Design a protein with these regions (language model features):
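Short, polar/proline-rich extracytoplasmic segments that appear immediately after membrane translocation
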Residues: 1-56
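Buried hydrophobic-core signal for structured, non-transmembrane domains
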Residues: 18, 83-87, 145-149
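Intrinsic-disorder/low-complexity, polar/charged segments enriched in Ser/Thr/Lys/Arg/Asp/Glu/Gln
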Residues: 25-27, 80-84, 125-127
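Short acidic, flexible loop segments centered on an aromatic residue
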Residues: 33-35, 92-107
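Beta-sheet-dominated interaction scaffolds and their linkers
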Residues: 35-90
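Beta-strand-rich interaction surfaces with strong enrichment in secreted/lumenal proteins
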Residues: 72-73, 114-120
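C-terminal, structured domain-capping segment
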Residues: 90-92, 121-153
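Short beta-strand and strand-turn-strand segments in soluble, beta-rich domains
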Residues: 105-115
Length: 153
């Protein structure tokens, strides 16, 4: 009986003890799918400015190509391209979509309302326009290295 009482006392102490953190290992599976099956689809807009949003290498990595020789655009200019590409929410819930530029001159490019975010319902699309301001830049400056398109439920 004293041994049983000691065992219960130890069990109670363990069961009521506090802890500050817990760690657990879980398995996760992430599959890459083609754009037609993705939760967000990017497509060139079906209009004249959609021609600037190109998959030059055929690898699904789109680029904004403003000249056929990829030399760039003039300095001290402002270029606005309406309706360049479309983002479609193919998921099962609404998401807030934002575009963030990565590079040295991200303040010189804007993606309209997607700079601060826009909510897309299931099946909804948004057409993205691009504004580029090269004032203050010099010949050879690279405006962006890449963009991140984020979707948060």
């Amino acid at each position: 009986l004293p041994l049983l009482a000691l065992g219960l006392a130890a069990l109670i102490c363990v069961a009521t003890g506090a802890f500050t953190s817990v760690s657990a290992v879980r398995a996760a599976e992430v599959n890459v799918v083609g754009d037609s099956n993705a939760l967000l689809t990017l497509t060139p807009y079906n209009g004249p400015n959609g021609a600037y949003f190109v998959d030059g290498n055929g690898d699904g990595a789109y680029e904004l190509a403003l000249s056929s020789d990829h030399r760039g655009i003039n300095v001290n200019a402002t270029i606005v391209l309406h309706d360049v590409f479309t983002i479609t929410n193919n998921g099962t819930q609404q998401v807030r979509v934002t575009i963030t530029g990565i590079g040295d001159h991200t303040n010189n490019i804007s993606f309209g309302s997607l700079d601060t975010g826009m909510t897309l319902g299931v099946g909804q699309s948004v057409t993205v326009s691009v504004r580029i301001d090269t004032h203050g830049l010099t010949d050879g400056d690279r405006i962006l290295d890449s963009i991140i398109i984020s979707a948060e439920a």
